[in-house]
Swiss-Prot record:
Protein's name in the database: Zinc metalloproteinase-disintegrin-like bothrojarin-2
Chain location of the short sequence motif D/ECD-tripeptide per the record: 78-80
EC number(s) reported in the record: 3.4.24.-
Highest taxon above the source species: Eukaryota
PTM characteristics: Glycosylated.
Entry annotated with the keyword Glycoprotein: yes
């Protein structure tokens, strides 16, 4: 047996134009004509004006498509490509970037998914502006395969770095504290060299933390 409250919840009210609720049959509802602040909406009918091309989006302004050529997503690095409005859509085109493996930052790195990952920037992110990449000798710790130094860690299985892959494991930085400073957490990827980072001339770290030829890495 239903109580009154359950029964009342099933009553469907007819749509009311002007109550600021988008209901069945309405394209918009911006309140009364006096209070409406939506230039795209005809407050009297709760329909969009006939000239409206769009209501929202990176390439929509005052209910019309922004002219073609206006940048809607700026270039975030030299590996990225700026996107511009097409004049035919309210949405910014799909994010695009230069080909993975293209040299960047004066050949200190290679493009990877729109960024140019290099160890120096990763040291800066971990330890601040005074940090630089440590000497090559520090990275040799990564062949130990212990709690801190490894190439892969999956559950309890720790895989040490092969000698040729040591620069794809734990990131080592030269700081005021130590010449071989590093950071770690319970997250097995924290403090590790980022995927796509240059590990030798013509080579980058792949997703398995192997230092492989840049032409086959992606």
């Amino acid at each position: 047996r239903q109580n009154r409250h359950e029964a009342s919840c099933r009553i469907v009210s007819p749509p009311v134009c002007g109550n600021e609720l988008l209901e069945k049959g309405e394209e918009c509802d911006c309140g009364s004509p006096r209070n409406c602040r939506d230039p795209c909406c005809d407050a009297a009918t709760c329909k969009l004006h006939s000239w409206v091309e769009c209501e929202s989006g990176e390439c929509c302004d005052q209910c019309r498509f922004i002219k073609a050529g206006n940048v809607c997503r700026p270039q975030r690095s030299e590996c990225d490509i700026a996107e511009s409005c097409t004049g035919q859509s309210a949405q910014c085109p799909t994010d695009d970037f230069h080909k993975n493996g293209q040299p960047c930052l004066s050949n200190y790195g290679y493009c990877y998914n729109g960024n140019c990952p290099i160890m120096h920037h990763q040291c800066y992110a971990l330890f601040g502006s005074g940090a630089i990449v440590a000497q090559d000798g520090c990275f040799k710790f990564n062949d130990r395969g212990d709690k801190f130094f490894y190439c892969r860690k999956e559950n309890v299985i720790i895989t040490p770095c092969a000698q040729e892959d040591v620069k794809c494991g734990r990131l080592f930085c030269h700081t005021k504290k130590s010449e071989c400073d590093f950071d770690y957490s319970e997250d097995p990827d924290y403090g590790m060299v980022d995927h796509g980072t240059k590990c030798a001339d013509g080579k980058v770290c792949n997703s398995n933390r192997q230092c492989v030829d840049v032409t086959t890495a992606y």
